[in-house]
């Protein structure tokens, strides 16, 4: 079976319960469509689980991008404050106070190699996986939000997205 999940945001216990609920096995494949980290304390453990599990594939979300902008080789101006305001403090603490420099570098290297979208075919059906919003530019794919009236821009392709809370689309809280 093929599964997709996004916006786990450090909720390792809920993620593990999900894996148990779906009876995730070596015959399955799970796509984590970004935002495994931040807000809750166990995001780095989720990254390690994905890194160590051959049948899990992760895409870059805006929270991983903020982490890279802050801790990556370019150390973008203002990135740390933006990341902190968006719940990055827990991930920052975990990477710097609970991981060795070697492990931290492995994790950052993993994040730097993540794609921002992925096209897959399941039983003849095309799927476009993206954290933010389907689009031509990287920022849209990572940061964009879909709207209820949006349709797939790709013919015969179903888009599976994260980032935008479902209640924003349905109006149901």
Regions found by a protein language model. Give the residues of each.
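Active-site-proximal beta-strand elements of phosphoester/diester hydrolases
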Residues: 1-9, 126-133
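Hydrophobic positions in the central parallel beta-sheet of the AAA+
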Residues: 3, 30-32, 128, 159-160
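Acidic, His/Gly-enriched loop-helix segments that form or flank divalent-metal centers
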Residues: 82-173
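Core catalytic region of metal-dependent phosphoesterases/phosphodiesterases
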Residues: 5, 10-83
């Amino acid at each position: 079976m093929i599964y997709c999940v996004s916006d786990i945001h450090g909720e390792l216990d809920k993620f593990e319960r999900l894996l148990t609920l779906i009876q995730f096995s070596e015959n399955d494949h799970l796509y984590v469509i970004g935002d495994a980290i931040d807000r809750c304390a166990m995001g780095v453990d989720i990254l390690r689980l994905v890194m160590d599990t051959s049948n899990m594939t992760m895409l870059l979300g805006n929270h991983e991008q903020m982490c890279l902008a802050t801790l990556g080789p370019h150390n973008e101006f203002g990135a740390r404050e933006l990341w902190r305001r968006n719940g990055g403090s827990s991930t920052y603490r975990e990477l710097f106070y609970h991981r060795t420099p070697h492990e931290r570098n492995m994790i950052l290297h993993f994040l730097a190699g993540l794609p921002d979208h992925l096209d897959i075919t399941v039983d003849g059906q095309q799927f476009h996986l993206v954290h933010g919003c389907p689009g031509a530019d990287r920022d849209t794919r990572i940061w964009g939000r879909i709207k209820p009236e949006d349709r797939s821009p790709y013919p015969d392709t179903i888009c599976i997205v994260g980032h935008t809370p479902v209640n924003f689309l349905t109006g149901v809280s």
